[in-house]
Amino acid sequence: QSGKCLETYQTMGYTPYYYFNQNSSFGTESELRDLISSFKAAGIGTVADVVVNHHNTTGWFTFPAETYKGVTYQLLPTDITANDDGGKTALEAARQDVALSTNNDEGEDWGGMRDLDHKSQNVQNIIKAYVRYLKDDLGYTGFRYDMVKGFAASHVADYNKAAGIEFSVGEYWDSNANIQSWIENTGKNSAAFDFQFRYNVRDAANGGNWTLLNSTNNLMHDATLRQYAVTFVENHDTQYRSPSETG
């Protein structure tokens, strides 16, 4: 999980409220540290799920203050994108006389939480401190960036460099050409999930047409980008829900 969430019910961790508190639905921070240490002792690295596109709040605009190593970090209403939540946040901000960022979202809007303005120096400082904490304090050896379609790819490169991390993968769920563009826009500082190959395998299995496995419309068959391809199998986004869904 990316950090402690606000909800009292079990959650997968995609609604982060705290960054520097790692107690979660999966266990305590102490248990997490023991797990990472045990894996490391066995020569296995652990990848953190980094959710920084959006952030939960109390009410519309209140972020928690967190103190780590003597420094207090707190996101502000001015760190929220100007067009967050399809403009609903701006309407509420006007009603409460609250100032948002003047910058629109750099990518896709994610409704339900406050989308962060990654051009904000405060946002950048907090996230850089957070990813350093994940690597240097908790002991993670890699990052999986959630919802990277929501902010510019260049920020992933900046955060990786700030942490000194050796491996990261972005969840850029789109066509092969757009995934390739995203990798290029990170300056080839991150890998990406090879979602197109996942669909090649799905279609081959569903239709009994195994020649689809020879498709070159994926990252793994691109000689210049295959080193940045991470095979994607399945997750909670693709689980079976009803006969009408074909994910």
Mark where each language-model region is.
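Active-site-proximal helices and loops of the catalytic beta/alpha 8
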Residues: 3-7, 14-15, 36-38, 44, ...
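Short glycine/proline-rich turn/loop motifs
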Residues: 16-17, 104-119, 137, 235-241
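Short flexible/disordered coil segments
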Residues: 56-67, 113-116, 166, 205-213, ...
